[in-house]
C-alpha cells in the first residue's frame, strides 16, 4: 500500500488515484493553490441538517411485528421492510418501542420478554430484536432511539405479567386505573426500577437516543374531564410521601425527579445518547391564551414539560402537536412558537406530527405546511419533526410519500448536531478508491461518515456510513455511487459535529 499522502484540507480539493490513501491535515495554509477539481466543483458547504424521525410502536403490534409469536425470520424480514421504507423516505431516525408495558423487546435480567413480540410475556422470541434493529438501522444510515413507556404496567389483558414482571414482584406498587394497570410514579422504588431499566439499555446497546413518551401519571379515562372526575388511586402513596403538599404539585415533583435522575443516569453511561421526551402538546389550557382544551397535562398527568426543557433535562423535546394549523383552538402554528419560547436551555425542539390523522378532513398538504413552519421557527440547521407513526407513512396516507419526496424530504439530511454533548471538532477520514470500491479509515470519535456527491449542479448527501461498533477504527468499504466522479467525505462525531471535508475525484 502506498505511503499516506498528506493533502490540503477541505478549503481545497485534490484529484486522487485509485490506489492512494488520502487524509486531510490542518498543516496547510489557507492561501494554498486549489486543484482543477476545486475549481470545477466548489467546496461543499455544511451538511444539510434536519431531524426526520418516525415512531415505531410494538404495543398492540401497531407497527411491528404484524402479530405476536411470528418466527425470528418473519419478524426480521418485517423489520427490514420497515427500515427500508424509512430510508427510502429519507428519514434519518427511528424511535423504536422497547418497553411497551413493564416488559422488554430485548433480553433483560430486569424485566420479562414482551408478549407483543413472542406471544406470551416472558417467552423468548429466539433472538435479540433490539440488537438486530440497531445494527440494521445503522446500516441504512438511520439513528435508532430506544423508546420506553415509563409507568405502564399492563397494556393488554391478553398478555398477563410473568413471574419476574415488576407488577408480580411488587403488586403494592401498581394501581388499576382506566381499565389498565399502572406503576405508581409516587413510589420511589418504581422510579428507581425504571431508571435501572433505561440505564441497562444505554449500557448494553449502541442506541443513538433514549426516548420517553407521554404516559407519566395516566390520562383520565375517556368520558371524564380530568383527575377530579376519576382520581388516580394513589391515596396510600400520598399519605406516605406527600408531607402535606398539594397533591398535584407532589405528583409533578415525582415526575420531575424521575426525568432529571433518568437524564443524569443516561449521561453517566452514554454521554452522546440524545435523551428525548414526547409530552402531550398542550402544556396547559389557556397557554397561550387562545388555546382551549379539557386536559391539563400539568395538573392531570404531572407533566411539567416546560420545566424539563428549560432545565436541560432532555436533549430534544417532541411535544405531540397533533392538531392542524387551523382552527385556532389547538393551532399547531400557535403552539409551536410558544414551545420555542420556553427553550431557554437551547435544546432541540422537534414536534410530533400526526400522519395517522391524514384523511378526508386533513390532506397530506397539512404535514408539508407544518414542516415548513418547523423550518421557519427553528435555528438554522436545527429543525426537525417526529412522525406518528411509521405505519401511516408506509401506508402512504393521502399520498404523503410523494408529498414528502417531491417536497421537504426530496434529498437526504443528517441529524442536527448537539454541541452540548461534545464540542470537539473531529478529524476528517482517510480514504482510497479502488475498482469502484471506496475504502475509508475513520478518524477517532467517528459516529458516521457522510458521503456527498457532486452532480454538476450541487452537492448531495448520498449516504451516512457507520463505523464498526466493535472495531471503530476498522476500514469501512462502500461502493462508489453510480456515475459519481467527485466525492466529499466528512466525519460526524458522536455529538453530530462535522469535520472538514476530504475531497475525492474518481479518476
Where do the language-model regions lie?
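Substrate-binding cleft of secreted/luminal carbohydrate-active enzymes
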Residues: 316-325, 347-415
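Catalytic domains of carbohydrate-active enzymes, especially glycoside hydrolases
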Residues: 77-102
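Active-site neighborhood of glycoside hydrolase catalytic domains
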Residues: 204, 223-279, 283-287, 299-300, ...
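Aromatic- and acidic-residue-enriched segments that line the glycan-binding/catalytic groove
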Residues: 106-118, 152-177, 214-240, 288-295
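N-terminal export signals
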Residues: 2-14, 20-40
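Active-site-adjacent "subsite" loops/lids of carbohydrate-active enzymes
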Residues: 61-74, 151-200
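Conserved aromatic anchor
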Residues: 437-443
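Beta-strand-rich modules
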Residues: 481-495
Amino acid at each position: 500500500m502506498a505511503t499516506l499522502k498528506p493533502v490540503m484540507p477541505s478549503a481545497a480539493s485534490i484529484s486522487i488515484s485509485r490506489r492512494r490513501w488520502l487524509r486531510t491535515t490542518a498543516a496547510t495554509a489557507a492561501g494554498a493553490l486549489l486543484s482543477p477539481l476545486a475549481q470545477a466543483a466548489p467546496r461543499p458547504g455544511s451538511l444539510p441538517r434536519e431531524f426526520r424521525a418516525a415512531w415505531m410502536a410494538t404495543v398492540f403490534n401497531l407497527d411491528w411485528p404484524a402479530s405476536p409469536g411470528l418466527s425470528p425470520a418473519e419478524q426480521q424480514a418485517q423489520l427490514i421492510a420497515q427500515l427500508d421504507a424509512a430510508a427510502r423516505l429519507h428519514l434519518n431516525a427511528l424511535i423504536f418501542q422497547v418497553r411497551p408495558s413493564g416488559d422488554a423487546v430485548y433480553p433483560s435480567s430486569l424485566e420479562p420478554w414482551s408478549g407483543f413480540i413472542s406471544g406470551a410475556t416472558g417467552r423468548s422470541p429466539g433472538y435479540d430484536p433490539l440488537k438486530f434493529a440497531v445494527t440494521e438501522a445503522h446500516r441504512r444510515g438511520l439513528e435508532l432511539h430506544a423508546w420506553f413507556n415509563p409507568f405502564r404496567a399492563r397494556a393488554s389483558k391478553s398478555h398477563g405479567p410473568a413471574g419476574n414482571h415488576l407488577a408480580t414482584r411488587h403488586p403494592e406498587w401498581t394501581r388499576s386505573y382506566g381499565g389498565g394497570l399502572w406503576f405508581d410514579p409516587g413510589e420511589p422504588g418504581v422510579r428507581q426500577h425504571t431508571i435501572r431499566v433505561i440505564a441497562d439499555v444505554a449500557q448494553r446497546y449502541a442506541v443513538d437516543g433514549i426516548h420517553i413518551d407521554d404516559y407519566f401519571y395516566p390520562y383520565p379515562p375517556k368520558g371524564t374531564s380530568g383527575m377530579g372526575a376519576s382520581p388516580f388511586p394513589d391515596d396510600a402513596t400520598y399519605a406516605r410521601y406527600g408531607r402535606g403538599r398539594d397533591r398535584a404539585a407532589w405528583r409533578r415533583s415525582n415526575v420531575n425527579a424521575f426525568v432529571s435522575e433518568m437524564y443524569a443516569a443516561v449521561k453517566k453511561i452514554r454521554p452522546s445518547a440524545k435523551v428525548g421526551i414526547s409530552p402531550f402538546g398542550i402544556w396547559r389550557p389557556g397557554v397561550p391564551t387562545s388555546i382551549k382544551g379539557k386536559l391539563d397535562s400539568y395538573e392531570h398527568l404531572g407533566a411539567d414539560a416546560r420545566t424539563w426543557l428549560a432545565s436541560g433535562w432532555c436533549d430534544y423535546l417532541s411535544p405531540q402537536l397533533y392538531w392542524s394549523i387551523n382552527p385556532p383552538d389547538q393551532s399547531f402554528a400557535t403552539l409551536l412558537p410558544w414551545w420555542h419560547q420556553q427553550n431557554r436551555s437551547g435544546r432541540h425542539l422537534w414536534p410530533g406530527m400526526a400522519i395517522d390523522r391524514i384523511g378526508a378532513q386533513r390532506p397530506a398538504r397539512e404535514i408539508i405546511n407544518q414542516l415548513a413552519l418547523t423550518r421557519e421557527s427553528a435555528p438554522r440547521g436545527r429543525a426537525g419533526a417526529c412522525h406518528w407513526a411509521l405505519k401511516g407513512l408506509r401506508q402512504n396516507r393521502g399520498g404523503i410519500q410523494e408529498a414528502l419526496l417531491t417536497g421537504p424530504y426530496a434529498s437526504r439530511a443528517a441529524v442536527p448536531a448537539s454541541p452540548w454533548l461534545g464540542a470537539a471538532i473531529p478529524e476528517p477520514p482517510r480514504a482510497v478508491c479502488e475498482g469502484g470500491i471506496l475504502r475509508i479509515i475513520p478518524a477517532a470519535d467517528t459516529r458516521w461518515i457522510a458521503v456527498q456527491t457532486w452532480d454538476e449542479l450541487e452537492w448531495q448527501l448520498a449516504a451516512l456510513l457507520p463505523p464498526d461498533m466493535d472495531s471503530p477504527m476498522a476500514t469501512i468499504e462502500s461502493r462508489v455511487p453510480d456515475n459519481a466522479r467527485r466525492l466529499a467525505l466528512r466525519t460526524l462525531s458522536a455529538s453530530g459535529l462535522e469535520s472538514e471535508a476530504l475531497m475525492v475525484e474518481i479518476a
